[in-house]
């Protein structure tokens, strides 16, 4: 069996053999892994695949294996969030997206590695050790959904689910040379996803091609009454896969090509824009003046929400519990021992931003900036159909290179976090290489206009071969 297959190819292979055999081959590949992409491999995957064979399931993903980020609840599998404090926590319920996947016949291979509580851009803060980039095992895969991107790039799953709070699907997609989509806020239910920053995050798919992104979105998107932010947009994603950008208007925000961008990244992205132009699209430069404040606004809002969300992890009801002479001592010791350095840093900064003397100065000001950033997107997208820019300003960096310098690491999100503030859809698609490392093109669209984003990405992909390249480290 080929190591890298599209969903259509996997389904064809299942017809030729069985879901059980295909799943077994993926599990064999996982067993030989060099990337540390999985925290947990499901012991029930083969049983689940065999059941699909016996029952003759005819769902859109019948027998197709998938990997799940370890902050998305799956009954019977640990949901650690990459943290010691939830190392042994097994949820008693499925996330909404998992229910949708199971109903479609998908086989869950396991739970993927991630930055602790999704706080990071490199998957180095995981309690279970860093994940390696399949293109260079000494480099990071990006984060926080680094495990999900790495296993797709390494051929250890045909596709995966991640979550994106400030770039956590798109960053690893760019670093690992795969496709990753952050849907419009509200398009995919967050029910059953352990919250980092509720107002920013969305569940999103990662795959080796744009078609499989659309296939997965048709399964997981839709209204969920258990999620108060859920919206039923009735979008049909696969119908957007039209190889035609004639008449498509592309906006190029100059602020996304700022100081510090790698020259090869800038060149590859411009080549991609000109390729779309050759195929019939037009482009114009647009300005988004408040983008320069987005990174600071994002981190204040995200850390503030995190400080509130993570207050629930105290060892009382579930997860790791340290011993203490009384309840207060137990909680203090549990949180001190259970959380990693980066998580504790963000809890402290978020608590500070929400404190009485600084709430107006920091948090409320960040919310005002968020509104201005959203207005920048609205204005720019009123003139064009999509925006195009680099996903990440630089290629993947070496493991350990930035982990001791949090400010430098935070700057990695400069091109991705504005999209989460605005709530618009954004996709990263491979568009080139520099020194053997992948480069991602970021395509952004109007709220719930994933079809325009997918159309642009699909057309670019069909007329280039970047998505067909495979990492030599794991070939």
Curated annotation (Swiss-Prot):
User: What name does the UniProt record give this protein?
Assistant: Glutamyl-tRNA(Gln) amidotransferase subunit A
* Phosphoprotein is among the record's keywords: no
**What's the EC number here?**
6.3.5.7
Give the matching Pfam families: Amidase
Q: Which reaction does it catalyse?
A: L-glutamyl-tRNA(Gln) + L-glutamine + ATP + H2O = L-glutaminyl-tRNA(Gln) + L-glutamate + ADP + phosphate + H(+)
Give me the Gene Ontology terms describing cellular component. Answer: glutamyl-tRNA(Gln) amidotransferase complex
Q: Give the HAMAP family listed for this entry.
A: GatA
What does this protein do, in the record's words? Allows the formation of correctly charged Gln-tRNA(Gln) through the transamidation of misacylated Glu-tRNA(Gln) in organisms which lack glutaminyl-tRNA synthetase. The reaction takes place in the presence of glutamine and ATP through an activated gamma-phospho-Glu-tRNA(Gln).
What family does this belong to? Belongs to the amidase family. GatA subfamily.
Q: Which UniProt keywords apply?
A: ATP-binding, Ligase, Nucleotide-binding, Protein biosynthesis
Transmembrane ranges, per UniProt, are: none
> What are the GO BP annotations of this UniProt entry?
translation
Biological source species: Methanosarcina barkeri (strain Fusaro / DSM 804)
Source species taxonomy: Archaea, Methanobacteriati, Methanobacteriota, Stenosarchaea group, Methanomicrobia
| Entries under InterPro entries matching the protein | Amidase (IPR000120), Amidase_CS (IPR020556), Amidase_dom (IPR023631), AS_sf (IPR036928), GatA (IPR004412)
Q: Which GO terms describe its molecular function?
A: ATP binding; glutaminyl-tRNA synthase (glutamine-hydrolyzing) activity
Subunit record text: Heterotrimer of A, B and C subunits.
Q: Which Gene3D superfamilies match?
A: Amidase signature (AS) domain (3.90.1300.10)
The answer to whether keyword Transmembrane helix applies is no
Active site (UniProt): 69, 144, 168
